[in-house]
Amino acid sequence: MNLKLGIVGWPLTKTYSPLIHKLLGEFLGINLEYQKVPIENLDRQKIQDINSKFDGYNITVPHKNKIIELIENTDGYLPDHHVKELGICNTIKLVDNNIYAFNTDIEGINKTLESIYTKINNKNILILGSGGSSKTIEYLFEEHNTVQIASREPNLDSISYNEINDIAPKIDILINTTPIGMPPFEEESLNIPFNQFNNLEVFFNLGYNVKE
């Protein structure tokens, strides 16, 4: 099997996705080519060009929402139920002129936390950041848990970072979805009162620091 895959996002200066997929292809015995496709401003023409060259691709920041706007009215567009409900997509599969759209973040996050908890119920969860990943996590856990989001621009659905002090002692799971620690924010740190999280069971960082 020969597959040409890629990752679409910006800036993609220090992503490990090509290396990870190279190793995965070797492990599975698949002849797999995986390329970085750095695009700052995504539009329909660029998506058409990508679709003509690849068998599938991942979408990362800042395009997980934008991609849906650009392909949802295209013939052959087939989103999974998570993409339909959330409007957030991180994986495209191209087969026989059909565009299959998936949100695999949901399964990845769920499996990671279920390696710690058998069931994630009745937990107080605080999510740092209010982007696409934050909405995915809220969607995943809000039915059986208390989920709050901290945002630099708080609204009716989120709190400000200054309010974290008030709820920190009650939080069981803290999840960072901000780009802090990732390019180009490697030298920045989360300005939150870690010493106030007296009952914290898990700190889950969705990003990775290249130095680590």
Language model: regions and residue ranges:
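Phosphate/diphosphate ligand-binding glycine-rich loop within oxidoreductases
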Residues: 2-115
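Glycine-rich adenosine-cofactor-binding loop
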Residues: 9, 101-106, 113-143, 151
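Residues in the short beta-alpha loop(s) of Rossmann-like NAD(P)-binding domains
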Residues: 11, 153-155, 209
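Short glycine-rich anion-binding loops that position phosphate/pyrophosphate groups of nucleotides
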Residues: 56-66, 133, 179-182, 208-209
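A short helix->loop->beta-strand "cap" motif at the edges of active sites that frequently abuts
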Residues: 94-95, 144-146, 198-201
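NAD(P)-binding Rossmann-fold cofactor-contacting core
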Residues: 143-160
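Rossmann-like adenosine-cofactor binding region
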Residues: 157-212
